[in-house]
Structures are given as C-alpha cells and as structure tokens.
Amino acid sequence: MSIFNYLRRRASTASVAKERLQIIISHERSQRNTPDYLPKLQEEILAVIAKYVNISRDQVSVNLERMEDSAVLELNITMPDKALEDSNS
C-alpha cells in the first residue's frame, strides 16, 4: 500500500463524513421548526385510535409542512387488518 492510496482513501472517507453531517444538520434544522404541540397531538390521536383499533405508536406519524402562506398537517396511520371488535368476538 502506497502513501498515495492511503491519502486517497481518507479523502473519500472525509467526503462521506461531510455528507452525513449535512444530512444530520438538515434534519436538525427541520426539527427546530416543528411546534411544541406536535408530539402531544400525536399521543392524543394515538389514544383515540387505540380505543377502536389495536395499533402501536410507530404506526402513527404526524408531520407539519410549512409553505409560504400555509401549513399542511400530514397524518399517516398504518391500520391493521381487523378492528378490536372483530378480534374480541
């Protein structure tokens, strides 16, 4: 292994690390703009749905997208095949 190969490999590692840091920073910036009530809203929505359907926390996703003149609240729920009533019978 020559010194040039060693230095070339480190450069690619540095670029990968830089790319990963940019992704992390972008994610952190997007999280900073979320309102404080969003986690509480997600918990309350989960509680209401859990009354009727057997569902876990990771099956409910709440996102807020802000645009210039509006905001969109996106709610994604992965529903199971059957409701609680069907499984209790």
UniProtKB/Swiss-Prot annotation:
InterPro entries: MinE, MinE_sf. Keywords: Cell cycle, Cell division. One of its GO terms (biological process) is cell division. Pfam families: MinE. Disulfide bonds: none annotated. The keyword Cell cycle applies. The keyword Cell division applies. Gene3D superfamilies: Cell division topological specificity factor MinE (3.30.1070.10). Belongs to the MinE family. Prevents the cell division inhibition by proteins MinC and MinD at internal division sites while permitting inhibition at polar sites. This ensures cell division at the proper site by restricting the formation of a division septum at the midpoint of the long axis of the cell. This is Cell division topological specificity factor. It comes from Legionella pneumophila (strain Corby). The gene is minE.
